[in-house]
């Protein structure tokens, strides 16, 4: 069974984990609906790239 040769210091441990931070999701302003939404996703009102791709009735039926 492997045993560490030396104690891992806090600095070594934290610098190794530095790339594991969370990133802020990319939000974009949708000019059609006037709301912010995640990029490459349909808005809550069913619009994508300025066109309505999902009707609002079918979007609310999934609740």
From Swiss-Prot:
Keyword Ion transport included in the entry's annotation: no
InterPro entries: Ribosomal_bL32, Ribosomal_bL32_bact, Ribosomal_zn-bd
Record-level GO BP terms: translation
Keyword Ribonucleoprotein attributed: yes
Listed GO MF terms: structural constituent of ribosome
A Pfam family this chain is assigned to: Ribosomal_L32p
Superkingdom of the organism of origin: Bacteria
An example Gene Ontology CC term for this record: large ribosomal subunit
Name of the gene encoding the protein in the UniProt record: rpmF
Protein name listed in UniProt: Large ribosomal subunit protein bL32
Keyword annotations: Ribonucleoprotein, Ribosomal protein
Family: Belongs to the bacterial ribosomal protein bL32 family.
